[in-house]
């Protein structure tokens, strides 16, 4: 749940679809 290069909104708060 490290939304960096993933399409999930996590603790990072970065949603990269």
UniProtKB/Swiss-Prot annotation:
List localization entries: Secreted
- Coiled-coil-forming residues are none
Question: Keyword annotations for this protein?
Answer: Secreted
The lineage's top-level taxon is Eukaryota
Recorded GO CC terms:
extracellular region
Tissue-specific expression? Expressed in skin glands.
* Stated role: May act as an antimicrobial peptide.
Q: Into which family does the record put it?
A: Belongs to the Frog skin active peptide (FSAP) family. Septenin subfamily.
Q: Which named protein is this?
A: Septenin 1j
């Amino acid at each position: 749940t490290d939304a960096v290069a993933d399409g999930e909104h996590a603790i990072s708060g970065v949603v990269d679809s």
